[in-house]
Amino acid sequence: MGKDVKKVHKLRHDPLSKQIEESESAYQKPHKRVGKLRKKKAEMENDTGIDETESVIPSALSKKILDQIREQAIEVEVEDRKKEKQEKLLTFEQERIQSKLLSFNDFIDDDDDDEDADQDDNKRRSNGNDFDENDGFEQFSDTESQFGVGGEVEIDEEDERVLSMFMGGGGGDGQEQQFQTRFTLGDIIESKLKEHESRQVSSENAINPKVIDVYTKVGKLLETYTSGKIPRAFRILPNFTNWEDLLYLTRPDKWTPHSIRVATKLFCMSTNSKITQRFLSIVVLPRVRDNIAEYKKLNYHLYMALKKSLYRPAAFYKAILLPLAESGDCTLLEAKIIGSVVCKVSIPVLHSSVALMKLSQLTRYNGATSMFIRMLCDKKYALPYRVIDGLVDHFVMFDEEVRELPVLWHRALLSFVQRYKTDITKDQKEKLKIILRKHNHHIITAEIRRELFFSNSRGGVAPSNFTDDTSSMME
């Protein structure tokens, strides 16, 4: 059964008092229409008292206000400090700024991380855009050359005997005499330090003693360095105008091979080609030659330093390869090791073309010259005709040579003919024919003759039934 609903009795009319007030006879006060702004203004003027509850700020709001004030104060203080620092940098002398940067307590920089000495080079190659565009290394790759290695160079005793006639003024023991007179990296640095000490006494632009102390300590660290970070003072070394004097203070002749590798990477990536060339010339090349002379092989990290130096191919050719060929005392082992770096790394054709041109213009013959020419020819570059003409003139130059030429010379000529036989003119082939008559090898000369005279020439075609007079010499 459902619940009973109570009936609510509503009033049939308003109370009597309300009816009297609303009656027409009652007095009504006229209503004034006041705007909201005027009404609020009137209330504020009439409010003479102060409500104590409205004067108290809540704790949360007060905390927020204080935090904002504190942040604004910190920002103002930071801006003031920046302005003061800029003013100090403008007013302080350059020597004082330099001593501050070279503070020994700030040697290790936590911002930049250097890779370990044995880390792969792929990450470094990905930053190719940081290099100079003139070096042509935007597509550089630290992998095996796409042109092929060119084969292993064999060195026999007979070849060494013949080559010794072209070294040391024509004597049989010229190679040993050259090793006795060649200065090591330590000897060079000792002489440079003595010159620096003599200039330090009389020169007005002497190096700050604090800077000398810093880089002396840097050299001590590099004597035991194997991997990890390098001192910050050494990383900013290439930025100074007198970087070479500061470099000698670190004694590069006592560095570990790991230090040589890291320093080569630093100079190749953070400096221009001219500074890189100077560093390779005074540090890397003497150190590589000393290591080969002592151990009859090259340390792995020094070999990797040579590969790193090819980030700057122009600097590599000017500081390492060409000076070796021009020196006249480059051993076959040195040429073989350094030439293998050229074979394994892809190098822009323009730099290699200039190097071949310079090698072909050398008047003093050395076995290293033939080895370098052979290795560069085996890379199968599309050489300009001017370079090919220069190489032809290089081999024709030996027409007046009365001494027996080594096998390396014949192999270099064979490699050149195999790669560029169609780019040689008919007149140039006739000149080479005369050379083949005078300087003959019982195996290689026949192969050169077959490649040279049974192929197309530049501007013409060789006869199919061509016979050469040098065939009688092979019998």
UniProtKB/Swiss-Prot annotation:
Principal location: nucleus
Record field: transmembrane: none
Record flagged with keyword Nucleus: yes
Pfam families registered for this protein in UniProt: Bystin
UniProt-annotated stretches for the region Disordered: 1-57, 106-149
GO cellular component, one term: cytoplasm
GO biological process, one term: rRNA processing
PANTHER family: BYSTIN (PTHR12821:SF0)
Record's protein name: Bystin
Native organism: Dictyostelium discoideum (Social amoeba)
Source species taxonomy: Eukaryota, Amoebozoa, Evosea, Eumycetozoa, Dictyostelia
